Swiss-Prot record:
Disulfide bonds listed in the record: none
Protein name as annotated: Biotin synthase
Gene3D superfamilies in the record: Aldolase class I
UniProt keyword terms in alphabetical order: 2Fe-2S, 4Fe-4S, Biotin biosynthesis, Iron, Iron-sulfur, Metal-binding, S-adenosyl-L-methionine, Transferase
Top EC class, one word: transferase
Subunit structure as annotated in this protein's UniProt entry: Homodimer.
SMART domains (UniProt xref): BATS (SM00876), Elp3 (SM00729)
Organism of this sequence: Erwinia tasmaniensis (strain DSM 17950 / CFBP 7177 / CIP 109463 / NCPPB 4357 / Et1/99)
Record-linked HAMAP family: BioB
BP terms from Gene Ontology: biotin biosynthetic process
UniProt entry tagged with the keyword RNA-binding: no
Superkingdom in the source lineage: Bacteria
Gene assigned in the entry: bioB
UniProt-annotated binding residues for [4Fe-4S] cluster: C51, C55, C58
């Protein structure tokens, strides 16, 4: 039976001396995972900007003047072309994100074709499209969608200070519909929104206490974008971010904890501590929707320095070839390792 976490228990973990917390997180990580393996994914923005939501951190909101040029939903073949290049570079999972409050019914046939096309290549599929109805979740599942990303962002108590156009319960409801449809769940949050340590603990309690914890838990560091209300937020202390990764690993021992947005602004040493704390998934060689990710050669060098190996997805078709291709690129410094799906 899964552990039911209390807020006080989560806060106690955050208050644990740093090195003791790291030791506990690493022990748990090694019990459930190979500590040298990191799951790698490619992310593509299939519809950018003009989002009606008011998330204060997001440059894709139509409410803020960030200089982001809005783009319509990409053509199916254009998306599949990007997926082919990602697979050729060794990616095991292809994630597609759209700046919507929710997908329109007129878009569903195109989204289904994207999922089907990527699946036919032997890759895992993931989408993040906003809120879903039960029927939409079922249609995506029928098309073969493996993962659906829908973040909770922060604690229920702090959430209203960040977003007013979508309720916390609506996010939880979407996760429930996704799970009910048989799609794996990807859900996490953001550090650096102005939240307290108690809010970080509250977020992780919400995630860990879902009927089934998410298979993937992305922990993002706020990327401050000029024009958004959070452009001048205080920087996140690297130790506080690493601590959040460690607590997530302890509270959700079987989940993949993803080091996600904000990696561009992290030093190699901070990223290394995140991996030590239990992070075992990244987006690589891509632009995270509208914010930068480390250059491909930087990812290559860091993997080699730390002795980390890419872990392919669980899709049966083509997995061995994908793993071998990426592993070969990791070992060859004169090869372009990572495909930038946002170019």
């Amino acid at each position: 039976m899964a552990t039911r976490w209390t807020l006080s228990q989560a806060q106690a973990l955050f208050e644990t001396p740093f090195l003791e917390l790291m030791f506990e997180a690493q022990q748990i990580h090694r019990h459930y995972f190979d500590p040298r393996q990191v799951q790698v994914s490619t992310l593509l923005s299939i519809k950018t900007g003009a989002c009606p939501e008011d998330c204060k951190y997001c440059p894709q909101s139509a409410r803020y003047k960030t200089g982001l040029e809005a783009e319509r939903l990409m053509e199916v073949e254009e998306v599949l072309s990007s997926a082919r290049k990602a697979k050729a570079a060794g990616s095991g999972r292809f994630c597609m994100g759209a700046a919507w409050k929710n997908p329109h019914e007129r878009d569903m046939p195109y989204l289904e074709k994207m999922v089907q096309g990527v699946k036919e290549m032997g890759m895992e599929t993931c989408m993040t499209l906003g809120s879903l109805s039960e029927q939409q979740a079922q249609r995506l599942a029928h098309a073969g969608l493996d993962f659906y990303n829908h973040n909770l962002d922060t604690s229920p108590e702090f959430y209203g200070s960040i977003i007013t156009t979508r309720s916390y319960q609506e996010r939880l409801d979407t996760l429930g519909k996704v799970r009910e449809a048989g799609i794996k769940v990807c859900s996490g949050g953001i550090v650096g929104l102005g939240e307290t340590v108690q809010d970080r603990a509250g977020l992780l309690v919400q995630l860990a206490n879902l009927p089934e914890p998410p298979e993937s838990v992305p922990i993002n560091m706020l990327v401050k974008v000029k024009g958004t209300p959070m452009a001048d937020n205080d920087d996140v202390d690297p130790f506080d971010f690493v601590r959040t990764i460690a607590v997530a690993r302890i509270m959700m021992p079987r989940s993949h904890v993803r080091l996600s947005a904000g990696r561009e602004q992290m030093s190699e040493q901070t990223q290394a501590m995140c991996f030590m704390a239990g992070a075992n998934s990244i987006f690589y060689g891509c632009k995270l929707l509208t914010t930068p990710n480390p250059d491909e050669d930087k990812d290559l060098l860091l993997f080699r320095k730390l002795g980390l190996n890419p872990r392919h997805g669980t899709t049966e078709s083509g997995d061995n070839a994908q793993q071998q291709a990426l592993a070969a690129q990791l070992l060859s410094a004169d090869t372009e390792q990572f495909y930038n799906a946002a170019r």
